[in-house]
Every structure is written in structure tokens, then in C-alpha cells.
Amino acid sequence: MTQAEIKLCSLLLQEHFGEIVEKIGVHLIRTGSQPLRVIAHDTGTSLDQVKKALCVLVQHNLVSYQVHKRGVVEYEAQCSRVLRMLRYPRYIYTTKTLYSDTGELIVEELLLNGKLTMSAVVKKVADRLTETMEDGKTMDYAEVSNTFVRLADTHFVQRCPSVPTTENSDPGPPPPAPTLVINEKDMYLVPKLSLIGKGKRRRSSDEDAAGEPKAKRPKYTTDNKEPIPDDGIYWQANLDRFHQHFRDQAIVSAVANRMDQTSSEIVRTMLRMSEITTSSSAPFTQPLSSNEIFRSLPVGYNISKQVLDQYLTLLADDPLEFVGKSGDSGGGMYVINLHKALASLATATLESVVQERFGSRCARIFRLVLQKKHIEQKQVEDFAMIPAKEAKDMLYKMLSENFMSLQEIPKTPDHAPSRTFYLYTVNILSAARMLLHRCYKSIANLIERRQFETKENKRLLEKSQRVEAIIASMQATGAEEAQLQEIEEMITAPERQQLETLKRNVNKLDASEIQVDETIFLLESYIECTMKRQ
């Protein structure tokens, strides 16, 4: 765990949960697993506050616990899960594009609350959607339930581990902490609920839009004496499935940039066909026949079977080897080499960074060293057609920034410089780790800058919010245009200009955070898949 990662975790925890939770979370990240009383003693926080902070962290899967032999429960921070909070806006936006506003709000509620039952999610989302609708219109629970089922079917949401029923019925003393288990086949099984009702607006707390008293409208079809059918069945967002989707999108974009739109659509179809059957850590997708791919192409995509076969052959023969041929049955069996695709994307990211930092000539040398694996300085000058002095400077720049490494191969045991080969090489894994570390630093700097900008203009922001609230309440009571204009003039022209500048700066910083996180995702995925292969 590097200092840059710890600092970023600290900023994220403070921004999402406040100072006390941040203090406990960072302490656990620094020290490793610890029991409750040791955490309270070391952080100088009251036992009650530590318990509440740990409750929040466990609820959001940021801390896990384990019961040791002597019955001591130790808590351990999940740093990688804390860093995933950076990606929350991306998870929510992805769901919006795939499942519209309803899907977006379902995932948003699960991310905001950590874990929720399906019935609670459906009710919250229906209420929120009803708030945004015109008067007289409401969102039906059944419609939200259908979207939830679709999210579960495509594995974007999953059940949380729960306490097994045998443990509850045990007559002996309860364990210090429950052991949570999940059955693989039940992970995406949606409970059969008959949710009847519609979303409510906040202002109509006594009666709903239809005028029926709130107490008389049944929430569920089950008798009130019976427990809610999904009581104890909690759901969470499946972040690994989102990461699989992001990876697939990156591969499709890379194929589109390298070849054309038709090739990318074929690859997208192959990925879509195997997205549920292929695990997120698998090196290859499931083999698919040419005939299956042809039948699964999007409706209205008019290409013949012969043209499809030609495209598949081109993709299989491409030097990047994103697509590989695994057999000849069914018109040819094809797979997507996910590990090679991630390696190519990580290499392209490194090349892009070298070009931006050091210029096109350095990028040329970098690509040459990548291609040749090991190369001497004299050979770099000859192959890259760059003068000796410039080539030496550029190689030293990249060497000092850890984009390259130097390997010594002595001719004699004494390692005399005159009798030693000095070969430049690129270790993609170590370069990716170095760049990932810098990305964490960049994100932390962006968050700090955004917080500074907001703090500097705190008074002005509060004034703007007050004015907006007054205008909204006056509009609701049917105030005249002149009155509204008078309230708006409470913010002067220079203040309005300052607000616009602040908004523009914060939007730029937010966009930069998301862009840097895209690079982080590619590098993390590449490092993870490489480590698994080793």
C-alpha cells in the first residue's frame, strides 16, 4: 500500500462519510486487521463512535471482519474497495445508458446505501421517479421491479452473503460475529415479490395522487402479520460485472480505431454473447462458432455470412491477436483473447503518455525498444534515425522517469564497462505500476483542488443556494415575474460571473477525475490479469 493510495483513500472516505469514519478507515488501512478495543485505543476515539464508524464501513463493504480461534473479532480495511468509490459516477452513468433512469436510480440507491432489500429499493426508486413526473402521474412498483430483475439477470446487481438458517436455529450461545455465506446458484436469484403500489410524492404524505388514504393502500400482497417475503435478502451492486463491461467497451473501441465499425460490432456481439458465461478473470471468452455469431448480430446489420467470415479471418490474422481461432467446427470457432487485449491497451496507454510527456521522437524510440525487446544505444540511433546526442538524452529521460530499464550483460566476470553490453528494455508491468502510482497522486491532487475551490467560495455558494430556494418557493406559490426578478438581483453581476467561473473549474476537475480513472482502470486490469497468469 503506497502513500499515494492511502492519501486517496483518506480523501474519498472523508468526502463520502466524514472525519470519524475517515479516521477509523485510514487507521485500519495503515495497520492491517485489528480488534475493536485496539482501534478505539489507538485512534483515541470513543468505543461507541468506533462501532458506528465500523457499521458504516461494513455496510458499504469497505471493511471485512474475521473471527479468530479465541473468539476475537478483527476488522480489516479493503483498500481496493475504497478506491472503487472513484468510479461510482461511471457505474451510475453506465446503468443509465443500458437501463434508462429506473436502472440508474436502482444502482445509485445500492451504492449510496451499500446494501438494501429489493422491496426497499423498489419503493425508494418509485418515489424518486414520481417526484420528477408531472402532477397526476406516478411510477408503478411493478415497472421498477422489472428493471431490477433485468439488472439481476445480467448480473449488474447480486445478493449479499447472509447468515445461514442453521446458525440461527443453533440453541448454543451466539458466535461473536455471524458467518456470512452465499450460494453461487442463488447469487442472482430474485425473490418472487408481488409489489403492488405506486411511488408517492413527499408533499402528499397523507393521501396519494388518487386520493386514497395512505394507510389503506396495501404495500404487499402478503398479510401484514407475515414477514416481508424478501426480509433478510439484501442486494448490492456487482462492481466486477461493471468492470467487465468497461473492459469490453475498451476492447470494442480499440478494434473500431484499428479497423472499422463493422469489425468492432462483430467483436461487441462476441463479447455480449459470452458476457454471462465468461468470468471477469478468464483469459479467453467462451469459443463461439461463426454461425452463432452470424445469428446474434444486431437486427438491421446487413452483412452476409461470407463477409462475416472474411472479417473474422482478418481479426484472427491481426498482429494484436484480439481475436483467435480455436477450431474449425460450425464454420470456425473463435475466441477473444482478453489478456492480450488488456496488454495491448496498457501498452498503448504507456505509448500515449510517453508521447505527451517527451514528444513524438521519444515515442518513436519507446516503440522501437518495445518491438526489439532488448537494444543497445547505438542500435537505437541507427534504427530510429536520430542523432547520437539526442538519442542519448531521450533514452536517459525515459530511463530516469522509469519508463525504461537498463540491463547489463558482462562479457567477462569483472564487469568492466568496456566489456559489458548495456541493453535498453521496457518492462511493461513495472512501467504500468509506476504510471498507476502517478495516476493515484493526480486524482488526489484533483480532489484537493476541487475541495479548495469550493471552500474558497463557500459564502457565495451558500448565498446562491438560499436565493434559489427562495425563488423555488415563490414560484410554487405563484409569485409575479417582477418579484422573482427582484430576488434574482440579490446576486450581483460580479458574483454571478464568479459563480460561473467556479462551476466551470469544478466541472473541469470532475471531468479530469473521470478521465484519469479510465487510465487507472486499464492499468489495474492489466496488472491484475498479468499477476494471475504468473
UniProtKB/Swiss-Prot annotation:
Keyword Transcription appears in the UniProt entry: yes
Organism name: Homo sapiens (Human)
Record's function text: DNA-dependent RNA polymerase catalyzes the transcription of DNA into RNA using the four ribonucleoside triphosphates as substrates. Specific peripheric component of RNA polymerase III (Pol III) which synthesizes small non-coding RNAs including 5S rRNA, snRNAs, tRNAs and miRNAs from at least 500 distinct genomic loci. Part of POLR3C/RPC3-POLR3F/RPC6-POLR3G/RPC7 heterotrimer, coordinates the dynamics of Pol III stalk and clamp modules during the transition from apo to elongation state. Pol III plays a key role in sensing and limiting infection by intracellular bacteria and DNA viruses.
Transmembrane segments: none
Protein family according to the UniProt entry: Belongs to the eukaryotic RPC3/POLR3C RNA polymerase subunit family.
UniProt KW keywords: Antiviral defense, DNA-binding, DNA-directed RNA polymerase, Immunity, Innate immunity, Nucleus, Phosphoprotein, Transcription
Stretches for region Disordered: 161-181, 197-228
A molecular function GO annotation: single-stranded DNA binding
Gene Ontology biological-process entries: defense response to virus; DNA-templated transcription; innate immune response; positive regulation of innate immune response; positive regulation of interferon-beta production; regulation of transcription by RNA polymerase III
Cellular compartment(s): Nucleus
Extent of Basic and acidic residues compositional bias: 211-228
UniProt-listed InterPro entries: POLR3C_WHD (IPR055207), RNA_pol_III_RPC82-rel_HTH (IPR013197), RNA_pol_III_Rpc82_C (IPR008806), RPC3 (IPR039748), WH-like_DNA-bd_sf (IPR036388)
Major location (coarse): nucleus
Protein name as catalogued: DNA-directed RNA polymerase III subunit RPC3
Gene Ontology annotations for the cellular component aspect, listed alphabetically: cytosol; nucleoplasm; RNA polymerase III complex
Residues carrying Phosphoserine: S194
Record's keyword annotation contains Transport: no
Pfam families: HTH_9, POLR3C_WHD, RNA_pol_Rpc82, RPC3_helical
Subunit details: Component of the RNA polymerase III complex consisting of 17 subunits: a ten-subunit horseshoe-shaped catalytic core composed of POLR3A/RPC1, POLR3B/RPC2, POLR1C/RPAC1, POLR1D/RPAC2, POLR3K/RPC10, POLR2E/RPABC1, POLR2F/RPABC2, POLR2H/RPABC3, POLR2K/RPABC4 and POLR2L/RPABC5; a mobile stalk composed of two subunits POLR3H/RPC8 and CRCP/RPC9, protruding from the core and functioning primarily in transcription initiation; and additional subunits homologous to general transcription factors of the RNA polymerase II machinery, POLR3C/RPC3-POLR3F/RPC6-POLR3G/RPC7 heterotrimer required for transcription initiation and POLR3D/RPC4-POLR3E/RPC5 heterodimer involved in both transcription initiation and termination.
Gene3D superfamilies on file: 6.10.140.1450, Winged helix-like DNA-binding domain superfamily/Winged helix DNA-binding domain (1.10.10.10)
Other information: Antibodies against POLR3C have been found in the sera of patients with systemic sclerosis (SSc).
The gene coding this protein: POLR3C
